[in-house]
Amino acid sequence: MTHDPQKDEFTVSVENLQGKHVLPPQHFDYICVASGHYSTPNFPEYPGIETFPGRVLHSHEFRNSLEFSGQKVLLVGSSYSGEDIAAQAIKFGAKEAIVCYRSVPTGLPWPKNIIEKPLLTHIERKTIHFSDNTQIDEVDSIIFCTGYIGHFPFMQDSLRHRSANSFYPPDLYKGVLYTQGGNNKVLYLGRQDVAYTFTMFDVQAFWTAKYILGDIELPKNEEMETNWKSWHER
């Protein structure tokens, strides 16, 4: 997808997986990016991870709790996926699940075989070290429950939104309108990392439709930047 600032129009080319064009280029006045951000896993790097002899995967790849039966499993990340997978692993026979949190413990009434540990610092083969100077030995598998990253390789570089997942990502007025290029005609839907996902999708879709139809008048660029920054910094 490219933008011609002189014509103020976008050109979209579609290819199949073999890199062959399957449709002639199409031209548009607005671009709505609604491909989501739950497809490219976020894999943080930890010293010594390459020495770990067991299985390492992301929650995106998790399919069957029975695969971890009889194992001691470390879950890096204590949000929704970490909580769910820990409970499922224990329910279906895991020996122990260690949930590693980044800032504060969840405080949940876990089953007896689930324990919480603070930030992971480094790994020495099957021994995991934590920020409170404790360690856990003989870990069999590590599951990263560390979210996803926005990945939009199909967008022109100047129009590609770059941000870690957050409640209110930068550069998006009203959480939708990209303010750094495209003459205020590029909109990203669903970039927020929130609990009420589908309700948010509906609201963003309504706002986007009204904006494209001309029912919403934008403030000056400086005001839009001030607006999204005030939300992003909360």
Task: List each model region and its residues.
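Mid-to-C-terminal Rossmann-like scaffold of FAD/NAD(P)H-dependent oxidoreductases
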Residues: 223-234
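Flavin (primarily FAD) cofactor-binding/catalytic cores of flavoenzymes
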Residues: 1-225
